[in-house]
Amino acid sequence: MQSTAATPGAPVERSLIVAIVDDDPAVCASLKFSLELEGFVVRAYGNAAEFLEANDFQACDCLVIDQRMPGMSGMELISRLRTLEVQTPAILLISQPNPTVAARAAKAAVPIVEKPLFGNTLLERIREACPRS
């Protein structure tokens, strides 16, 4: 049996923090559960305004943002964050592929993951965005 005790003097690696911004409570709960099982710390927000109001996006290692939300779309939120000089990697969730949104996402170097989510696609994108995960 392997020891789980930390080596004295060794750096302690913290869990990566993933923020989910999606107006569907079932999607938020499902993603939160799945990502926590993978060892991530997950913070869920019901819309862009709630996320911006929380003002803790600098502490996040990766953002998972739904495109279709009331008030502000996912790409609008990402653009707003970039204007605020937040460079946290973001992943856009999209349920209806749209060439205009895809072009904006590509220009912003934001990967798209299509809903419904199947397999490990989202997890793979998060790991690509945060290589130490």
How should these model regions be labeled?
Residues 44-62:
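Acidic, metal-coordinating helix/loop segments flanking the phosphotransfer/catalytic sites
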Residues 53, 75-86:
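Short amphipathic alpha-helix used as the core "switch/output" element in two-component signaling
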